[in-house]
Swiss-Prot record:
CDD domains: GIY-YIG_UvrC_Cho. It is found in: Cytoplasm. It holds the Pfam family UvrC_RNaseH. It comes from Protochlamydia amoebophila (strain UWE25). Its main location: cytoplasm. The UvrABC repair system catalyzes the recognition and processing of DNA lesions. UvrC both incises the 5' and 3' sides of the lesion. The N-terminal half is responsible for the 3' incision and the C-terminal half is responsible for the 5' incision. PROSITE patterns: GIY_YIG, UVRC. Belongs to the UvrC family. NCBIfam families: PRK00558.1-5, uvrC. Residues 13-92 form the GIY-YIG domain. The keyword DNA damage applies. Keywords: Cytoplasm, DNA damage, DNA excision, DNA repair, Excision nuclease, SOS response. This is UvrABC system protein C. GO terms for cellular component: cytoplasm; excinuclease repair complex.
Amino acid sequence: MSYDPKKIDLFPTLPGVYLMKNEEGEVLYVGKAKNLRQRVKQYFVPGRDGRLMIPYLVAKINYIETIVVTSEKEALLLENNLIKQHKPRYNALLKDDKSYIALKISQNDAWATVRLVRYKGTPEPDGLYFGPYTSAQAARQTLDLLNRLFPLRQCSDQEFARRTRPCLLYQMKRCVGPCTQKCTKGEYQQHLDRTIKFLRGQNKDVLKDLYEEMRLLSEQLEFEKANHLLRTIRYIEKTIESQYVDRPLGHDADAIGLFRYGEHVVVVLMIFRGGKLVGSRHFEFDNIIEEDHELLTSFLLQHYEGATEIPSEILLPSKISDEHPVEEILSARREQKVNLQIPQRGEKKALIEIAQKNAEALFKTQKDEATLREKTLLEMQELLFLTNYPTRIECFDNSNIAGSEPVSSMVAFTDGLKDSKRYRTYRLKIGSKPDDYAAMYEVLTRRYKRAKEENDMPDLVVVDGGKGQLNIAIKVFEELNITGVDLLGLAKEAGRHDKGMTAEQVFTCYQKEPILLKANSPILFLLQKIRDEAHRVAISFHRKRRSKKTLKSALDDIPGIGPAKRKTLLTHFGSLKKIELAADAELREVKGISAANIEAIRTFFQGRKE
């Protein structure tokens, strides 16, 4: 039943948020308005709103909920929270499943270090983060530079606790030796403060500090230390000079570009820190009914809520209606003023144009790649006589060594791309005797018995192997009474066991002889990619299983360490090597480990060395 627009006449004329829901109660869209009645009415006036997706949205609306607030700022915050909570299909929602790289300075360490870390979504609030960087290489280059300039410790906490004399880095003047009290807390903090300033682009402040310290050392006749500082100063000045070429800004800023094609939107974020372009990120949105100014507002609130840093200036491609409330919210999060600007000329305008061109180029590239993938899948359907268009493909591979720890993997590809959320690994229950057919029978039965119950069938199933493995798949599907799923077996050409792009045989259910695909076939390339991914996942899982078994076997030999304590130790430390290197104080932190157990652990590892 469609929504009756007459109900809107009862809506308040106050600012607030509205939630459009379908018959099942699913939230389809969340919006905000200065005047709820006036804004919601616009959706139901024919031709009033020209956005293509509006008729589709309106046709699905069964109920509209409104929430009145006291200000535009409150409406913005509530809208952002409701979008994150309900994940409406027609709103722009940032996904947090990507992994990002940053430099982290822990705030919990007495002697803090700079570490390269990866995180998803919002990072842990236990340190200062600098980034994200576009690549691990860029982050490592920055970390290497910091290690050359500022002598902070680089060792692990375990190594730091065990040190009785300084390491080689101390002799090289790359560390001030806090592990053996070669410096005071105040001296170490001074180096840490300079590191933070440098990462924030406050190079002039760092140089000023270093020049002042060098002057004091010279007055105290500490010429060797003063000379070392001078070398550091020259290195920083040289680094700064080399960066002027690609430093269009003199401060922290982000430049945002946006490209829209119908209801598909690409947003590009160019990140400048200390005036230098340190990276860029892109975000894609589909089925978006929000106008550009609404999408930009939503993007700003979502992105900078979980960002490691908020710059002092954000450059936008177009005006947003909620500019001042958004500035207030971002300034409160940063605890310093944040300016939103729409540049009209000069260098800043040029940066926005570059971001816009990047967004457009990215969209066109992805569109071309999507077209090629679709063409390959259509050719696969035709050439391999598939009943279904292979939107979702699942592939299986088994792994064992002489029957030990047999496992299987299942990988999934959707529209020709990895769909890692659907990956599965299986510990097999077959006996110790190697039997690839029994392994394939077990894993296929387990997977598709459940898939049938959950109505979660793929379009195509690929098994790694020839006619024999395909026959196992056919048998399983017949026993489970499953129809409508295509089955293929993939095997190298008879007599060929080499790696790489070689001709392969594809076995189908419809003909006795295999189909031979040429080495340069895009269909073969995709099938090999899927099969190799299944093999990689199976091998990785098998190694993990064997590693755990080896760890358990090794710890079995320690007197007084039973199954419960063994499991606790492995859970706490993660590896045999870390248990061996752990200090007594760290071992005492493990629940249930006594002084006698620690002595037994020490004796055990000492015996292994001898």
